[in-house]
Amino acid sequence: MNRLAFYIGIENLEEIKNMDNLYLKARLLVDLLFAEKKDKAGKPYLYHLYRVSDQMTTLEGKVAGLLHDVVEDIKTPDFPELDVTFDDLRDIKIPEEIIEALQLVTKTPPPTRFLSKQEKLNYYYQEIDTIIESNNLLAIELKTADMSDNYNPERLSELPEEKKEWFTQKYSEPLKKLKLVKERMITC
């Protein structure tokens, strides 16, 4: 059974499965999944998904922007067997091109939870390098849009100073690198 049914109900799942318009399918799915979720500043999480989607220029990009946090963030800690998977997205007919990009940008937890801040940063930087090395333009554009929104000065201003410093340290250099790679890929 598709795990999405646990979160959005069987009727909604069937409606989404049968939708032909890919963008509306993704939009309805995230509207249902993230309706109550808040970001680190206490704002509706959906706003982040919409902003990332709005930065993308193709239909596939806009859909990926909406869906980019579904597998990473829709979890039930006490019941990991209910975590949403990429197969759940395939089941609702999300194209493989989009799923491949989502797989590349979806963070995997570090091997241990007891890493130092520098080890966490190094692990994150390795994930960015993996995205770049994939040469998957959709994934590179998606990660660039996601990081640009997370590193937006307006959003950062709503966070405590410690979080601002962490995000600056985490996003500043990798974002520059991604933008450069994206620009090279587009102009070649």
Residue ranges and their predicted role:
Residues 2-188:
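Active-site helical microenvironments for divalent-metal-assisted chemistry
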